[in-house]
Curated annotation (Swiss-Prot):
Signal peptide: none
Record's protein name: Photosystem II reaction center protein J
Gene name as annotated: psbJ
Upper taxonomic lineage: Eukaryota, Viridiplantae, Streptophyta, Zygnematophyceae, Zygnematophycidae
Annotated source species: Staurastrum punctulatum (Green alga)
Keywords attached to this entry: Chloroplast, Membrane, Photosynthesis, Photosystem II, Plastid, Reaction center, Thylakoid, Transmembrane, Transmembrane helix
Family annotation (Gene3D superfamilies): 6.10.250.2070
Function: One of the components of the core complex of photosystem II (PSII). PSII is a light-driven water:plastoquinone oxidoreductase that uses light energy to abstract electrons from H(2)O, generating O(2) and a proton gradient subsequently used for ATP formation. It consists of a core antenna complex that captures photons, and an electron transfer chain that converts photonic excitation into a charge separation.
Gene Ontology biological process terms, A to Z: photosynthesis
Amino acid sequence: MSNVGTSGRIPLWLVGTVAGILVLGLVGLFFYGSYVGLGSSL
């Protein structure tokens, strides 16, 4: 992990990690919400 090419910007690996966590959280929340919604409606 070197800082080459990241002058004044956020490291790409950090952006990828945060984005991955957010995407997983949103997808999990979406599936959980749809599962609970379908379970309660059906």
